[in-house]
């Protein structure tokens, strides 16, 4: 999105974090399972911004303080970004189990052209659906559009 304010992309992150938290809360109301969803961002920069702006009380699945609360989308062959070196949702425990198996996720993207999660995510989940599309406004100007998809029943990659 184009704005007159060159700092526009730096604005609106608290609103974006609150938006993701609201979706987590609303989806939680439909499920008795506390912290059912983990959060995946479409790229590591978005994941970093959401990790900082997502309220601490947001009910997301967070297995340990070592894990990020918002994960960057993982590609097993891509280790080029900072989130690749943090505990990952696609990693296995020493016993071969996954902390994220069968969990549901919210996939968050700021790519307004994206109509569905990327193929690597669609293949890892039983199904996906678009939950919401929301423009983020700062000082009366749009700074980004956020799309949030629900992704159901994560299946970690086979060993």
Please give the residue ranges for each predicted region.
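Luminal/periplasmic acceptor-recognition loop/helix of membrane-associated glycosyltransferases
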Residues: 2-159
